[in-house]
């Protein structure tokens, strides 16, 4: 289930032609270039799905403020009622322990989702990715392959297959003078991709990388089948990586230390 998908064409219409100033620092494919477009998406969702839409840190602040009698990280963690969502959305023990009205959470770049939509105990985690179509570039980091493997394991262990989606909105833009102009968008659902086709860049902190526009959406199995298929893919890739690392970085030097 996606709250975004039914209104995607409206989002697309709003974004196409939108201009934002190019960043004063960083690359045109970096976080600074994509953030203004993410803010436009958030603004649209907040105006049209106001009761559902949060930044991840806003949701955590709201959850804890609605439960003022719950204190301490262990008690606050139980508010999630889901080990998988706890893993994906929570902050660390110390930060959760020390949270208060005077010490609210703030946005972190490594939050799992740019935007969180919540209704009837279902969560849609949305990441907004920007693509510079002016030149060919490496696909962006999407999510840690290890983090996704941990997520899949928790889904299977706790039989939590219908609580959340992880989806992506790509904003394709090009440079026009001092502006970045949106020329097209794409929307894709992670759990509709073919798990065995996800590219893991082990040299880039084990990040899964893809352009949203290019992500296959043909997977028709259950969520449990997706999770198991991804774990098989991850383990196979990790084993191959381990063999490669040993062959390259261990075997040539082992004779010097024996």
Swiss-Prot record:
Reactions mediated catalytically: Endonucleolytic cleavage of DNA to give specific double-stranded fragments with terminal 5'-phosphates
Origin superkingdom: Bacteria
Enzyme Commission identifier(s): 3.1.21.4
InterPro entries per record: DNA_rep_MutH/T2_RE_sf, Restrct_endonuc-II-like, Restrct_endonuc_II_HincII
Molecular-function GO terms, alphabetical: DNA binding; type II site-specific deoxyribonuclease activity
One biological process term in Gene Ontology: DNA restriction-modification system
Principal EC category: hydrolase
Keyword Transmembrane attached: no
Name of the protein: Type II restriction enzyme HincII
Natural source organism: Haemophilus influenzae
Gene: hincIIR
């Amino acid at each position: 289930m996606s709250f975004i998908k039914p209104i995607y064409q409206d989002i697309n219409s709003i974004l196409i032609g939108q201009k934002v100033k190019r960043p004063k620092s960083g690359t045109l494919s970096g976080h600074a270039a994509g953030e203004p477009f993410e803010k436009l998406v958030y603004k649209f969702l907040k105006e049209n799905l106001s009761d559902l839409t949060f930044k991840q840190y806003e949701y955590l602040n709201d959850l804890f403020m609605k439960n003022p009698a719950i204190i301490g990280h262990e008690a606050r963690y139980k508010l999630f009622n889901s080990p998988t969502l706890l893993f994906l959305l929570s902050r660390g023990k110390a930060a959760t322990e020390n949270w208060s009205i005077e010490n609210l959470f703030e946005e972190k770049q490594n939050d799992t989702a740019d935007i969180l939509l919540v209704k009837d105990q279902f969560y849609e985690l949305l990441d907004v990715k920007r693509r510079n179509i002016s030149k060919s570039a490496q696909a962006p980091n999407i999510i840690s392959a290890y983090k996704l493997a941990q997520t899949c394991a928790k889904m299977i262990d706790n039989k939590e297959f219908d609580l959340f989606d992880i989806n992506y909105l790509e904003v394709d833009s090009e440079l026009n003078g001092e502006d970045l102009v949106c020329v097209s968008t794409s929307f894709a659902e992670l759990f509709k991709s073919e798990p065995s086709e996800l590219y893991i860049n082990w040299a880039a902190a084990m990040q899964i990388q893809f352009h949203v526009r290019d992500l296959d959406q043909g997977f028709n199995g259950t969520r449990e089948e997706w999770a198991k298929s991804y774990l098989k893919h991850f383990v196979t890739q990790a084993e191959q990586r381990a063999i490669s690392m040993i062959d390259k970085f261990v075997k040539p030097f082992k004779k010097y230390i024996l």
